[in-house]
Amino acid sequence: MLTSDTLYGAIGIDINVDHIALCETNKDGNIVLIKKYPIHKENTKNKRNEELYQLAIEIMEQCKSKKKSLVVEDLNFKQLKTRMLYRPKKQNKTLSSFAYKKILEKVERKCLMNEVDVIKVDPKNTSKIGKEKYTKIKGLSVHYCAAYVINRRGMGFVD
């Protein structure tokens, strides 16, 4: 059940506090490439913004050169902030400094400017499914497997 946006496959990303895990698949939903983009939290704000900008360009170019759509999670930040009320202070600080929204906006903007489709999918249990279903079979980390699940959802596969 391919959508027209995923005729050649897709590229899914899982954005984490310290890195972005990328998983590219072919039209059949099989892994073609995995890649990790580190995010350096200790950089100054300007350096971090420049780094995120460069990552956005690199991810967009990856999609454009392969004629593949980008698949991302459609996260609800209001729910996340509500849940932060019940977490330890240190964890809240890490989540607050986490630039997920900033990264996503930069990547989406670059894709829009360069005519690369962005598909948003339900984020429910992507890491859990990736861990339980694919880590052993594929021999990959949870983050790569989460990117794989995100990717497959964007292509219309059900895991």
Regions of interest found by a model, annotated:
Residues 1-159:
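Positively charged, helix-rich recognition surfaces that bind polyanionic ligands
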